[in-house]
Amino acid sequence: LKEMGIEVDDAPVEEKLPFKVEMPKELTTREAQEVLDTLIEKGYLDADYQPSKLTGWQRGVLAYEIGLYLGFRNIWVVMATLWKSNPGTLRAYYSKSFNEDKAIEYSKEIKMLIR
């Protein structure tokens, strides 16, 4: 981003939050921070890295796409830790997305943003 003339805050993610969030180590990389910041900018996450007005299945798809892109070994645990959620619930939300007509388009939308 710096190469494109966009100002980048180099402070660690944890220092930018107004409250203490348990930030999984998988999300402390520069690449992960850029993904999270993009999702905040586009309104998918709030300033505290929490889902912003998303349905359950949208949270599941978002968690899956973030984890897949960043190569997490355990997507559900990492994202549930950040979002103060239960890994099993988050995974169930993702499974529920298979019943949603809009899920494929939503998944494509997320992929376009984070890649």
Predicted features and spans:
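Flexible coil/loop and intrinsically disordered linker positions at secondary-structure junctions
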Residues: 1-115
